[in-house]
From Swiss-Prot:
<keyword id="KW-0812">Transmembrane</keyword>
<dbReference type="GO" id="GO:0055036">
    <property type="term" value="C:virion membrane"/>
</dbReference>
<keyword id="KW-1161">Viral attachment to host cell</keyword>
<feature type="glycosylation site" description="N-linked (GlcNAc...) asparagine; by host">
    <location>
        <position position="560"/>
    </location>
</feature>
<feature type="site" description="Cleavage; by host furin">
    <location>
        <begin position="521"/>
        <end position="522"/>
    </location>
</feature>
<dbReference type="GO" id="GO:0020002">
    <property type="term" value="C:host cell plasma membrane"/>
</dbReference>
<keyword id="KW-1032">Host cell membrane</keyword>
<feature type="signal peptide">
    <location>
        <begin position="1"/>
        <end position="86"/>
    </location>
</feature>
<keyword id="KW-1040">Host Golgi apparatus</keyword>
<feature type="transmembrane region" description="Helical">
    <location>
        <begin position="850"/>
        <end position="870"/>
    </location>
</feature>
<comment type="similarity">
    <text>Belongs to the herpesviridae glycoprotein B family.</text>
</comment>
<feature type="compositionally biased region" description="Low complexity">
    <location>
        <begin position="505"/>
        <end position="516"/>
    </location>
</feature>
<protein>
    <recommendedName>
        <fullName>Envelope glycoprotein B</fullName>
    </recommendedName>
</protein>
<dbReference type="InterPro" id="IPR000234">
    <property type="entry name" value="Herpes_Glycoprot_B"/>
</dbReference>
<feature type="glycosylation site" description="N-linked (GlcNAc...) asparagine; by host">
    <location>
        <position position="497"/>
    </location>
</feature>
<keyword id="KW-1015">Disulfide bond</keyword>
<feature type="glycosylation site" description="N-linked (GlcNAc...) asparagine; by host">
    <location>
        <position position="380"/>
    </location>
</feature>
Length: 980
């Protein structure tokens, strides 16, 4: 193509006006036109005109002034140019971004204007671009000044401040006293046991038993128990409006010594007069016998009473329905008492006796005595305000911080990780009952802690203050100041000459706590009027009203406020809420401090950056304003304000050209040229040529140029990826992951919360909870069981048939063996029953009085028979002949002699000695025969051969032993002599 054709083509393509109204110049078409024909002067001249038009005017005039000249040249030389047909629509780009597409020629674009001729080179360049596959592109029109903005002036940054008034000090925390009031009491009573026993012929059984406790009279306590350590065996008691009398062992009244009891619990002592009960059984059967036992018992036990102290209980299980603080004094008369006045007695200067040591107390006491229907109770009277207290000390805190926050005080205790909240007004101890002990214990504990830890470093800045915290905890707090801070305060007071205001300066909250209240007016404050003659009626009315007020005040007794008018402080059983409050306050303080410091630092940083923004907006206003507004805008500085226009998002396609070179061989584009459409599905007529800006911004002009340089390398962001150009020619796409990122953000380094462990705390221990009731039931059960063991001989009255139990056990055993075993068991049990019955009969006979008498007589008869038998045996041993044959005695012999006419004085020489010797031998033989028979019987019984042999040998020996038997004479010599 000739140069003229190039000029016409270039002029025709470059005469399109954009939104800015400037004529766009295209120099990329000249290299692709055909070379002009040789000798074509007009073409060469038009080429020169084209080059002239392509060169920028030195004066900067717009190309519109030369439009007429260019149009005229084109009309004259139009026929010398060869026009090539182009396709109606450009083919879509191939899948490869860098590939060049080919199109057919010879087709005219119907969308062109009638006067516009399609240029195939222009379409070829357009189709050689790279389509942006993803990403958002924007186009920004130039600002005209219709919308202007300004940068905000610097702000005033907040200062970090907690906004609290902290005060350190020492505190003592009190809780509700749920433990009962304990004291020692003495119980006096006499235990009466009346038994009725039935005596049968062979058995004795307990038919009835009556047991009762009766009180010991106060006079007997004075005269015997506390005076001598003894007690009377007589008991007087009123039952059913009848006065009854009982005597121990049914005998006359005597004084018995009180001895320590064998059975006593660890927390109590007891004394009694006897350990046995009397059970009398007479000798006559088939009748009842009644016996009485009186045991005087004195017990020293523990007594308990709980608020409102209108009764107290004893460890014996007895409950006294009277206040332990009741007495005859003025302040004690208002206490509760359910008994008649004659049952109560109070003794001043009483000295009780110790029944163990038998010594009286050295210090006298005020003793109260109450006589109930069953016992008499005595205890030492004390004043209620001194002994009883509804609050008790829970914790001593050596380091406490109090701060005021939103109209309340917060007491933080780090040692137990707890925070208590209370009102800013102090709590009056007079509004709670029985709190006199609080001030004393609090002062002692605080002074002790101060002397141990803070005496050399701190000074007190006020008196003890009392605050009622949530949960029912009373906090006794005394503020302190360090010595250094106290010196600063003193120097300030001396400098300002306000030494009289030292206390208020050291403790500024003291005035707020001591709120003055308006005194209520009453008729008592009005002096009693004196009657006058002028106003008698009015003075009488005032006199009556004043009198009624005095009577009402006297009846109410305002000096002694009852417990019903006061509110008892109730304490929760757990302080988990206080521990959670401490944790929340700790976290809140840390977070608030952190956020406050961040806010202050952030504000300071923004003020410093504002100066940088103000200077940077002069260099690149569009980028600065877009970053500030977080929106794509085009900006231009108009003096002290900035004109902006909002950028429009490109909905159509954006094509990136492969080359960044311009028509001038020495000039190149500094940013890649693009072709885009504003809307989707737009034809070639709606395509716009522009240039790729920063952050996917599309310029509608291609005015960013630079001199061409060697070894040029550029990376440009195109959509969501980057494109790489080398020597002003597209090379490839670069993913963002291949490019290393350097962060411009500043990391925010925050301090984490410190670790804090929650310690389990018990407001009331297990022992305290078990000790809250009036009665200790375990102590009662032990006492009752041991009390039953005091009379340990009761079981001796009741007989238990243990034989029947044994027989039943044997019968059960045999039944388990089957039918055969049951038959054998019946036989065995029958025989055993007979034996047992016999033995039982004998035992019953022996238990019977008549049986005992018969046994006694039999024993005596046996002894007499034994005596005579013993005498007979001794007689046989001394003179067996006389015992066995009394005829041989001397008396018979003398009688025989007398019958024959002989005198008693005759000599005994006439006695026949031979016969006497024969008699002796016969007796000896008889004894040996008797012994032999016994030996033979034993041998036969034992069935032993040795015994039989010995018996036979003895028989043989007896046969050979002794003189030979001689026959006696037929006639007696004496008879013969008499006959002569």
């Amino acid at each position: 193509m000739s140069s003229g054709c190039r000029s016409v083509g270039g002029s025709t393509w470059g005469n399109w006006r954009g939104d800015g109204g400037d004529l766009r110049q295209r120099r990329v078409l000249s290299p692709v036109c055909s070379a002009p024909a040789a000798g074509s002067w007009i073409g060469s001249q038009l080429g020169n005109v084209g080059n002239l038009l392509a060169t920028p005017h030195p004066l900067g005039k717009p190309a519109s002034s030369r439009v007429g000249t260019i149009v005229l040249a084109c009309l004259l030389l139009f026929g010398s140019c060869v026009v090539r047909a182009v396709p109606t629509t450009p083919s879509p780009p191939t899948s490869t971004p860098t590939s060049m597409s080919t199109h057919s020629h010879g087709t005219v674009d119907p969308t062109l204007l009638p006067t516009e001729t399609p240029d195939p080179l222009r379409l070829a360049v357009r189709e050689s671009g790279i389509l942006a596959e993803d990403g958002d592109f924007y186009t920004c029109p130039p600002p005209t000044g219709s919308t202007v903005v300004r940068i905000e002036p610097p702000r005033t940054c907040p200062k970090f401040d907690l906004g609290r008034n902290f005060t350190e000090g020492i505190a003592v925390i009190f809780k509700e006293n749920i433990a009962p009031y304990k004291f020692r009491a003495n119980v006096y009573y006499k235990d009466i046991v009346v038994t009725r026993v039935w005596k049968g012929y062979s058995h004795t059984s307990l038919s009835d038993r009556y047991n009762d406790r009766v009180p010991v009279s106060v006079e007997e306590i004075f005269g015997l128990i506390d005076s001598k350590g003894k007690c009377s065996s007589k008991a007087e008691y009123l039952r059913d409006n009848i006065m009854h009398h009982a005597y121990h062992d049914d005998e006359d009244e005597v004084e018995l010594d009180l001895v320590p009891s064998k059975f006593a619990t660890p927390g109590a002592r007891a004394w009694q007069t006897t350990n046995d009960t009397t059970s009398y059984v007479g000798w006559m059967p088939w009748r009842h016998y009644t016996s009485t036992s009186v045991n005087c018992i004195v017990e020293e036990v523990e007594a308990r009473s709980v608020y409102p102290y209108d009764s107290f209980a004893l460890s014996t299980g007895d409950i006294v329905y009277a206040s332990p603080f009741y007495g005859l004094r003025a302040a004690a008369r208002i206490e509760h008492n359910s008994y008649a006045q004659e049952r109560f007695r109070q003794v001043e200067g009483y000295r009780p006796r110790d029944l163990d040591s038998k010594l009286q107390a050295e210090e006298p006491v005020t003793k109260n005595f109450i006589t109930t229907p069953h016992v008499t109770v005595s205890w030492n009277w004390t004043e209620k305000k001194v002994e009883a207290c509804t609050l008790t000390k829970w914790k001593e805190v050596d380091e406490l911080v109090r701060d005021e926050f939103r109209g309340s005080y917060r007491f933080t205790i780090r040692s137990i990780s707890s925070t208590f909240i209370s009102n800013t007004t102090q709590f009056k101890l007079e509004s709670a009952p029985l709190t006199e002990c609080v001030s004393k214990e609090a002062k002692e504990a605080i002074d002790s802690i101060y002397k141990k830890q803070y005496e050399s470093t701190h000074v007190f800045s006020g008196d003890v203050e009392y605050y009622l915290a949530r949960g029912g905890f009373l906090i006794a707090f005394r503020p302190m100041l360090s010595n250094e801070l106290a010196r600063l305060y003193l120097n300030e007071l001396v400098r300002s000459n306000r030494t009289y205001d030292l206390k208020n300066l050291l403790n500024p909250n003291a005035n707020n706590n001591n709120n003055t209240t308006r005194r209520r007016r009453s008729l008592l404050s009005v002096p009693e009027p004196q009657p006058t003659q002028d106003g008698v009626h009015r003075e009488q009315i005032l006199h009556r009203l004043h009198k009624r007020a005095v009577e009402a005040t006297a009846g109410t007794d305002s000096s002694n406020v009852t417990a019903k008018q006061l509110e008892l402080i109730k304490t929760t059983s757990s302080i988990e809420f206080a521990m959670l409050q401490f944790a929340y306050d700790h976290i809140q303080s840390h977070v608030n401090e952190m956020l406050s410091r961040i806010a202050t630092a952030w504000c300071t940083l923004q003020n410093k950056e504002r100066t940088l923004w103000n200077e940077m907006v002069k260099i690149n206003p569009s980028a600065i304003v877009s970053a500030t507004l977080d929106e794509r805008v085009a900006a231009r500085v108009l003096g002290d304000v900035i004109a902006i226009t909002h950028c429009a998002k490109i909905e159509g396609n954006v094509y990136l050209q492969n080359s960044m070179r311009s028509m001038d061989s020495n000039t190149c584009y500094s940013r890649p040229p693009v072709t885009f459409t504003i809307t989707k599905n737009a034809n070639n007529r709606g395509s716009i040529e522009g240039q790729l800006g920063e952050e996917n911004e599309i310029f509608t002009e291609r005015k960013l140029i630079e001199p061409c340089a060697l070894n040029q390398k550029r990376y440009f962001k195109f959509g969501k990826e980057y494109v790489y150009y080398e020597n002003y020619t597209f090379v490839r796409k670069v993913p963002p992951t291949e490019i290393e990122v350097i962060s411009t953000y500043v990391e925010l380094n925050l301090t984490l919360l410190e670790d804090r462990e929650f310690l389990p705390l018990e407001v009331y221990t297990r022992a305290e909870l078990e000790d809250t009731g009036l009665l200790d039931y375990s102590e009662i059960q032990r006492r009752n069981q041991l009390h039953a063991l005091r009379f340990y001989d009761i079981d001796s009255v009741v007989n238990v048939d243990n034989t029947a139990v044994i027989m039943q056990g044997i019968a059960s055993f045999f039944k388990g063996l089957g039918k055969v075993g049951e038959a054998v068991g019946t036989l065995v049990l029958g025989a055993a029953g007979a034996v047992v019955s016999t033995v039982s009969g004998i035992a019953s006979f022996l238990n019977n009085p008549f049986g005992g008498l018969a046994i006694g007589l039999l024993v005596i008869a046996g002894l007499v028979a034994a005596f005579f038998a013993y005498r007979y045996v001794m007689q046989i041993r001394s003179n067996p002949m006389k015992a066995l044959y009394p005829i041989t005695t001397k008396a018979l012999k003398n009688k025989a002699k007398t019958s024959y006419g002989q005198n008693e004085e005759d000599d005994g020489s006439d006695f026949d000695e031979a016969k006497l010797e024969e008699a002796r031998e016969m007796i000896k033989y008889m004894s040996m025969v008797s012994a032999l028979e016994k030996q033979e019987k034993k041998a036969i019984k034992k069935n032993s051969g040795v015994g039989l042999i010995a018996s036979n040998v003895s028989k043989l020996a007896l046969r050979r032993r002794g003189p030979k038997y001689t026959r006696l004479q037929q006639n007696d010599t004496m008879e013969n002599e008499k006959m002569v």
